[in-house]
Swiss-Prot record:
Function: Redox regulated molecular chaperone. Protects both thermally unfolding and oxidatively damaged proteins from irreversible aggregation. Plays an important role in the bacterial defense system toward oxidative stress.
Protein name (Swiss-Prot/TrEMBL): 33 kDa chaperonin
Predominant localisation class: cytoplasm
Origin species: Synechococcus sp. (strain CC9902)
Keyword Chaperone: yes
Lineage top rank: taxon: Bacteria
Length: 305
């Protein structure tokens, strides 16, 4: 079943809602990068969050980058998400595994804080017009949802609830997705509504179970979570859209990256390896430039480069 994103409003238009499923997207990322369940879950949460942030951009080609920079053993992660529903990403230490931890109810889960360590969440919004908007906030706990909510509050001054989750078993990813709840500016002036939304967000428990139960029907998920706020999917043509893993790397771009190395370094590479090999961080695609082609590239460069 294809992943999708749904935009909606609630409380008479005072609340903005975005729900996204990223199950197939995450499965592809896991297969491409050889991710452990821990790193797959963390990357999946970041991809869901990135897509939900990108969904509010005005231009179709707008993109959002989320980068977790920290001192933890995961060695950071990076997500590039587009308003068009495409997303890609990678993890610094894809095979990382840590012992699970238990909560007060005896349920076991991943130790996101230990994986992430201390550090920062860097967010970049790029609409293709002028300089991208960049902002950085300290990590709250490394589970992604709270970290992105902190960014929205402190950098965009938008009170938000960000819920990301997944269901897994020993065989892999059963479902993955997220939910974004934002109080729009006019509604933020109504204390009773703000208090109601904050209460509803505090009451959301078992988001991952609710996500799995909706079986990719995100409209049902919105009604399940906010039954008394009358969530209404937008009626325009982009109220819903497909979501997929897609990388923008190409062989031509890889050749362009080789040119930046210069004649001397490429000549040393030719002598040592007989070819050049580049691997895309985002999708793990491998591009090989064979000996004859590499010689042609070197001969086309000025000697001083």
């Amino acid at each position: 079943m294809a992943d999708r994103l749904v935009r909606a409003t609630a409380a008479g238009g005072g609340i903005r809602l975005v729900a996204v499923s990223t199950t197939e997207t995450l499965r592809e990322a896991q297969a491409r990068h050889g991710l452990s369940l821990l790193t797959a879950v963390m990357l999946g949460r970041a991809m869901s969050a990135g897509l939900m942030l990108a969904s509010s951009m005005k231009v179709r080609h707008g993109r959002v980058n989320l980068r977790l920079g920290s001192d933890g053993p995961i060695k950071g992660l990076m997500v590039d998400a587009g308003r068009d529903g495409t997303v890609r990403g990678y993890v610094g230490e894809p095979a990382l595994e840590l012992d699970p931890i238990s909560d007060e109810k005896g349920n076991y889960g991943f130790n996101f804080k230990a994986a992430a360590g201390t550090g920062y969440l860097h967010v970049m919004r790029d609409d293709g017009k002028g300089e991208p908007f960049n902002s950085t906030v300290e990590l709250v706990g490394g589970a992604i949802g709270e970290d992105v909510a902190s960014y929205l509050l402190h950098s965009e001054q938008t009170p938000s609830g960000v819920f990301v989750g997944e269901k897994i078993n020993r065989d892999g990813i059963l479902c993955s997705g997220g939910l974004l709840v934002q109080i729009l500016p006019k509604a933020a002036e109504e204390p009773a509504l703000v208090e109601l939304i904050e209460q509803r967000c505090r009451e959301i428990e078992g988001f991952s179970e609710r996500l799995a139960a909706c079986n990719n029907n995100l409209e049902d998920l919105l009604i399940d979570v906010f039954p008394d706020l009358d969530p209404q999917p937008l009626t325009d043509t982009e109220a819903t859209q497909d979501v997929r893993f897609k990388c923008r790397c190409t062989r031509e771009r890889s050749i362009g990256a080789l040119l930046l190395l210069g004649r001397k370094e490429l000549s040393e590479m030719l002598e040592a390896d007989g070819q050049a090999e580049l691997t895309c961080h985002f999708c793990n695609n491998r591009y090989v430039v064979e000996r004859e082609e590499l010689i042609g590239i070197i001969e086309g460069l000025p000697a001083a480069v």
